[in-house]
Amino acid sequence: MKKNYLLYFLLLALSTPIWVSCNDWTESEAKDYFEGPSEEYYAALRAYKKSDHPKAFGWFGNWTGEGASLVNSMAGIPDSVDVVSIWGNWSNITEAQKKDLKFCQEVKGTRFTMCFIITSVGTQITPQHIYDNWESMGFASQQEAVNDFWGWPSDESDKEAVEASIRKYANAIADTINKYGYDGFDIDYEPNYGNKGNIVDDDDRMFIFVDELGKHFGPKSGTGKLLIIDGEPQSIKNRPDVGPYFDYFIIQAYKPGNDNNLDKRLIDGGVAGPGLVQTYGSVMSEEQITKMT
């Protein structure tokens, strides 16, 4: 009998801590054990991004600022990235997007530019009601309604009207960027890859467009906001004086194959038109162009 009591107490002693432990394991309230980066870390990160160093750049699409995963949030972009161009979803942003943007700008020191392909006056920012109501507004075509909204003349030999229309469009882009609190504009310039239009088909008109943007963004503006050109910046061959308006040149070079191919795009061309240095070398030094690229 004593043996049975001894066995009973021994089993009770063994089972008690197990029961207590299991009770701890099954607590219904979730605990967050993650400790985020310290303020010292973020301060050092912001200081690094303000320093003179090779810049990390990328495009970011499908931005929502929401979800359990950070795949659609700017907060999920690696901390070391300096500048991000927003590809799509940059208009009518939600509160979640505003919060996401503000955190990355103010805490991480990352800079965000609006980006889209430039072709003609009105691209991307013509009010939707113009496209929806052009017939009821009495226009013969949708394009005629767009041209009327921006003041684009039917007679393109009217250079003053053409210039006024281009500058109106550039200012509307600037207003949009400032409205959302972005850090500048990234011009996606690809006229030799099917993206034709009444601005990009003419280097003088392209200069007018950049000149007006340059009052708001880029090194000539004094605002500290960025003006970037990506795609084919080397192709504005007839207006090299446009080069100093930009903070950065970004050459799109998909599947270049080797370093020599990249060098040609930068220096002496023969791969995708002229090299950057060939285009802008008369107004900028090779060192300056290289550092901006």
Give residue spans per PLM region.
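Chitinase-like catalytic core of GlcNAc-active glycosidases
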Residues: D52-T293
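Bacterial Sec-dependent N-terminal signal peptides
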Residues: M1-L6, L11-S51
